[in-house]
UniProtKB/Swiss-Prot annotation:
Lineage: Bacteria, Bacillati, Actinomycetota, Actinomycetes, Mycobacteriales
UniProt KW tRNA processing keyword: yes
Role: Formation of pseudouridine at positions 38, 39 and 40 in the anticodon stem and loop of transfer RNAs.
Catalytic activity: uridine(38/39/40) in tRNA = pseudouridine(38/39/40) in tRNA
GO biological process, one term: tRNA pseudouridine synthesis
Binding-site list for substrate: Y98
Family: Belongs to the tRNA pseudouridine synthase TruA family.
Gene (name only): truA
Source organism superkingdom: Bacteria
Protein name: tRNA pseudouridine synthase A
Organism: Mycolicibacterium paratuberculosis (strain ATCC BAA-968 / K-10)
CDD domains: PseudoU_synth_EcTruA
GO MF annotation terms: RNA binding; tRNA pseudouridine(38-40) synthase activity
Name of one Pfam family that matches: PseudoU_synth_1
Enzyme Commission number(s) of this protein: 5.4.99.12
Subunit annotation: Homodimer.
Length: 251
């Protein structure tokens, strides 16, 4: 997605620009709440929208419309605003929110939902999955649930991980200050092993003592996962949050 947007923005502004997103999602993962920023030279702004906004239209309304014409139908930019001083889409963020959806229906997933719901046509003990999830909340080293990246910390503050069932549809809602590579899909994959009674509830907690990614579970399919939101502090705290996050991530 980032490459597609960079190409479209470069075309619109007629100068090379690079978008920086709040979260770098795995291939196949969806995002309805992604936030990103880019720095644009002032001289390039007239290239993007030579016409003034319509009466009552937002400042970047013309840019929003024009950008939409350069993007494929499965990529949309829904809002553009001026960023406050000190804002960084990635490092100023307080937390990210993800949703994972799967269906246990024996016949699979409805065609109109198949792009964002994983078919899991077998019984799941949601109460056991919820109990195992509670053991994972808080500040931990999630190395067992992260793909290795050189010099990258795997310590994260997992603030929410709960499950709900609505008929055959099972939904996980996951929030943390940040997620390492494939962490959400790995958490879901491990918890599915608990839900199928292949592992006890205590197993996920035991994985937290590992220093490397575990091979005892399968990562959940990417298409069931969606980034649904990113939280930021008040404008006057953005720069400080940026510095704090950079310091933590560099350790």
């Amino acid at each position: 997605m980032a490459g597609v947007l960079d190409e479209a923005l470069t075309t619109v502004f007629r100068t090379p620009v690079r978008l920086r997103a709040a979260g770098r999602t795995d291939a196949g993962v969806h995002a309805t709440g992604q936030v990103a920023h880019l720095d644009v030279p002032g001289t390039a702004l007239p290239n993007a929208y030579p016409r003034a906004p319509h009466v009552g239209e937002a400042e970047f309304g013309p840019l929003l419309r024009r950008l939409g014409r350069f993007l494929p139908t499965d990529v949309r930019v829904v809002d553009i605003t001026r960023a406050p001083a000190g804002f960084d889409a990635r490092f100023s963020a307080l937390r990210r929110h993800y949703v994972y959806r799967l269906s246990t229906a024996p016949w699979g997933v409805l065609p109109q939902q198949a792009r964002y719901v994983t078919a899991w046509p077998r019984p799941l003990d949601v109460e056991a999955m919820a109990a195992a999830s509670r053991d994972l909340l808080g500040l931990h080293d999630f190395a067992a649930f992260c793909r290795h990246r050189e010099n990258a910390t795997t310590i994260r503050d997992l603030q929410r991980l709960d499950w709900t069932r609505d008929g055959d549809l099972i939904t996980a809602r996951v929030s943390a200050d940040a997620f390492c590579w494939s962490m959400v899909r790995s958490l879901v994959g491990a918890l599915l092993a608990v839900g199928e009674n292949r592992r006890p509830v205590s197993w996920c907690r035991e994985l937290l003592s590992a220093t490397n990614r575990s091979s005892d579970y399968a990562t959940a399919p990417a298409h069931g996962l969606t980034l649904v939101g990113v939280d930021y502090p008040p404008d006057d705290q953005l720069a400080a949050r940026n510095l704090i996050t950079r310091d933590v991530r560099s350790r």
